[in-house]
Amino acid sequence: MTSMSHHRSLQAELETLTTEAFRPELAEIDQLPTLEIARLMNGEDATVPAAVAARLPQIAAAIDAVADRMARGGRLVYAGAGTAGRLGVLDASECPPTFNTDPSEVVGLIAGGPSAMVTSIEGAEDSKELAAGDLAGLGLTADDTVVGVSASGRTPYAIGAVEYARARGALTVGLSCNADSALAAAADHGIEIVAGPELLTGSTRLKAGTAQKLVLNMLSTITMIRLGKTYGNLMVDVRASNEKLRARSRRIVALATGAADEEVERALAATDGEVKNAILTILGGVDGPTAARLLEESDGHLRAALAAAPR
C-alpha cells in the first residue's frame, strides 16, 4: 500500500467514527460570546453521564471480574495513548494514597513511556509491538487485568495491549467511545461509551476524555470497595502521607466509631496510624496486635474482622 493510499484509507476510517464527526451547527462557534460558548460546552458535558449510565451493566460485569482477579493477587493495568493513557496513569497514581495499595498493584502504561505524560511521542500510539514490550516488562500473569483505553477504539497500542494480555490468559477490558470498535471486540469485556461528536471536531480530550475518566473512576473505586478497602463510604485504607491525610485519618476513625478525640488518638497510636486497625480496636474491643491478626485472617475486610472479634 502506498503512503498516499494509506492516508486516504485512514481518513476514510476516521470519517466513520462518531468521535471524529464534524458538526456544521458549530462551524461559527468562534464568533460567539464567551459565555455562550461556555454554555454550549457545559451542555455538551452534561450529556456524558447518561452515556455512561447506558453501559452500567457492562461496567459492573467488568468490575466484578477485575475484583475476582485482584483478590487472587492480580494487578490492574491500564494501557493507552495520549489523553487515554494519561487518564489511566492518573487513576493508577491515585490508588496508593487513597486505598493504601502498593504502586505495583494498579499500573498505568502510556504509549511512549513517562515522558509522554507531558510531551507527544510521535508514532508511539501506532505500535502494537510497543504495548507488548511494555506488558512483557511487567511479567504479566493470568491473574492480572489489562484495560485498553482508546477514544477511537482503533488505537494500535491499546489493541496490542489487550491482544497480548488475552493471549497470556489475563483478563482484558476494552474501553472505547465508538460503537462496534476493534478494541471492544478484542477484549473479554467491551465497554463502549458513545458520548457523541465533540464540540471541537476530533478533540477527544473533551467528552470522550470525561467519559473515560468516569468509567476509570468506577473501575478502580468499586473494585477497591469489593476488596474491602472501604468501610461503608469511608476510606479506611487511606495512607496518611501528609498532614491533610493524617487529619482525615482521625476524622474517619471518629466517624466510624463515634469515639472522642482522645480515644481516637490512642487507637491510632496503638496501631501505628493504621485507620482500619484503629477502628477495629475501638469497635471490637481488641488490642493492636489482635486487630492486625483479625484483619489478616479476614483478607483486610473490616466488617468480617469485626464479626470475628471476641465479644
From Swiss-Prot:
This is N-acetylmuramic acid 6-phosphate etherase. The keyword Transcription regulation does not apply. It catalyses: N-acetyl-D-muramate 6-phosphate + H2O = N-acetyl-D-glucosamine 6-phosphate + (R)-lactate. GO terms for biological process: amino sugar catabolic process; N-acetylmuramic acid catabolic process; peptidoglycan turnover. Homodimer. The keyword Lyase applies. A lyase-type mechanism (elimination/hydration) is suggested for the cleavage of the lactyl ether bond of MurNAc 6-phosphate, with the formation of an alpha,beta-unsaturated aldehyde intermediate with (E)-stereochemistry, followed by the syn addition of water to give product. Keywords: Carbohydrate metabolism, Lyase. Its EC number is 4.2.1.126. It is an enzyme of class 4 (lyase). Specifically catalyzes the cleavage of the D-lactyl ether substituent of MurNAc 6-phosphate, producing GlcNAc 6-phosphate and D-lactate. Belongs to the GCKR-like family. MurNAc-6-P etherase subfamily.
